[in-house]
Amino acid sequence: NTGVSVENTAQELIATINIPYGTTATDVSIWGSNTTKTVEVYEMNIAANGKGSTVGTGTTNGSAISIGTVDSTTVNYLMIKISVSSTNHRIWGGVVTLTQN
């Protein structure tokens, strides 16, 4: 029983990831016990309200979700939102692919 899960199916799992200076984020991969759950990736801005801009969508099957080229700035970061439909669904982890500028 590793990974994270929700206590109520109305909840979502959220992760925020800094994009290190001098790098570009290009892909996100997420693994989970149910490989069909929806993953949404947003480029966020620390100086703005709301969810930001959607840069990619996919599922929890571990396949790379292309997010284009999200260059690091002084105000941006990534938010990954995973929607699950059961308290038994677990998210084991994920990776963000970075390239050096």
What are the residue ranges of the model-derived segments?
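Extracellular beta-rich ligand/substrate-recognition surface
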Residues: 1-12
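Extended extracellular/luminal ectodomain segments enriched in beta-structured repeat modules
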Residues: 10, 19-27
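Extracellular carbohydrate recognition and processing domains
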Residues: 50-72
